Amino acid sequence: MAIHNCEGENVSTENKAVYMDNSATTPVRKEVVEAMLPYMTENFGNPSSIYEIGKTSKHAINLARKKAADALGAEENEIYFTSGGTESDNWAIKGIAFANRDKGKHIITSSIEHHAVLHTCAWLEGQGFEVTYLPVDKYGMVSPDELRNAIRDDTILISIMFANNEIGTIQPIKEIGEIAKENQIYFHTDAVQAIGHVPIDVKKLNIDLLSLSGHEFEGPKGCGALYIRKGVKIDPLLHGGAQERKRRAGTENVPGIVGLGKATELATAEIEESNRTLLKLRDRLIEGLLKIPKTHLNGHPTQRLANNVNVTFEYIEGESLLLLLNAKGIYASTGSACNSSSLEPSHVLTACGVPHEIIHGSLRLSLGRMNTSEDVDRVLEVVPEIVQKLRNMSPLTPKEYRTL
């Protein structure tokens, strides 16, 4: 994959550039781009219009809706297109909260959710709602028993992410869904990281609302969806039009929706084959990185996404590691891309009990369809050298871990 710097020049590295930040965003697949292009040019009609090119756009949206529904085991009229995961999370949580506040004002979520969920819940607390933030174990796993104990008579919503964006831990979604159903509480899951990696059937898992975002599985940025089970009582987030069956106002992003539909279709059809490849690469990465002394794996050892590697190196700063990796043409992150500019320690690793003194030394490598065995070789060649270089420079590194 050809990658350029901000001046548009080729990145100079000993080998090709290696992109391992697919949990932040993914390149758009060629097939997805090809599906989108006609709706940026000749098929540009507004779907609300009654003339032919408007009808063509409307038909394209309906086809994309069917593809998204099929991927989730949902019905077509349960899929609503949005601008992405953040809007979907906001709509699900605020929409349920305000539509059902006559029944109660208590919401349950976890301490490791994406900030789109956490910040929305914090905002609702300012509006008079109460939120319980469930703790997680050292692997980032929510306890179903703790969830049961947190339920109150006035609990109206449980929002637990399907898989964590930083550490890749997959939650016991089926059990959580059963608990929610038993107690007649709405269950929302942020599945932004899970689509294309974990098979999802919303009916079998008792999911009432599910958020997804196209750019996380080789679809376009700026387009997502919210699954809302038929019969769920929810208020709109946006007002000003009758689009999306009067629930989500605003002229539809037809090219984005078409791309989302195609990306969803491809990603879900290829889960088995993709996971086989990704698991081999992931496990090689983990095995190789853990050979570096004083390195720890974050997240569940087995119940994790096939593309996720998150490790902590003692005695180094993750920001310095990323800068040196960037100079070598390796692109990774320390955690959530939506919070990458913050110097605050990861709220996810903090919740998992990672000691404060080493929490800043984390590295997330998230694999994608384009990654190869050679990419893994390159990372395993470069990372140990950089870690050692940084340890040699750090006054915190004990003598036995220096090579000066």
UniProtKB/Swiss-Prot annotation:
Cofactor: pyridoxal 5'-phosphate
Pfam families per UniProt: Aminotran_5
Pathway: Cofactor biosynthesis; iron-sulfur cluster biosynthesis
Catalysed reaction, written as an equation: (sulfur carrier)-H + L-cysteine = (sulfur carrier)-SH + L-alanine
Binding site for pyridoxal 5'-phosphate: 85-86, 165, 193, 213-215, 251
GO molecular function: 2 iron, 2 sulfur cluster binding; cysteine desulfurase activity; metal ion binding; pyridoxal phosphate binding
Record key words, sorted: 2Fe-2S, Cytoplasm, Iron, Iron-sulfur, Metal-binding, Pyridoxal phosphate, Transferase
Binding site for [2Fe-2S] cluster: 338
Cellular localization per UniProt: Cytoplasm
InterPro entries, per the entry: Aminotrans_V_dom, Cys_deSase_IscS, Cys_deSase_NifS_bac/arc, Cysteine_dSase, PyrdxlP-dep_Trfase, PyrdxlP-dep_Trfase_major, PyrdxlP-dep_Trfase_small
Active-site residue list: 338 (cysteine persulfide intermediate)
Matches recorded under Gene3D superfamilies: Aspartate Aminotransferase, domain 1 (3.90.1150.10), Type I PLP-dependent aspartate aminotransferase-like (Major domain) (3.40.640.10)
Any GO BP annotation: amino acid metabolic process
GO-annotated cellular components: cytoplasm
EC number of this enzyme: 2.8.1.7
Enzyme class (EC, first level): transferase
Subunit-level organization: Homodimer. Forms a heterotetramer with IscU, interacts with other sulfur acceptors.
Something else known: In Archaea the pyridoxal phosphate cofactor is not covalently bound to Lys but ligated by other amino acids.
Function: Master enzyme that delivers sulfur to a number of partners involved in Fe-S cluster assembly, tRNA modification or cofactor biosynthesis. Catalyzes the removal of elemental sulfur atoms from cysteine to produce alanine. Functions as a sulfur delivery protein for Fe-S cluster synthesis onto IscU, an Fe-S scaffold assembly protein, as well as other S acceptor proteins.
Similarity field: Belongs to the class-V pyridoxal-phosphate-dependent aminotransferase family. NifS/IscS subfamily.
Protein name: Cysteine desulfurase IscS
Organism expressing this protein natively: Methanosarcina thermophila
Gene: iscS
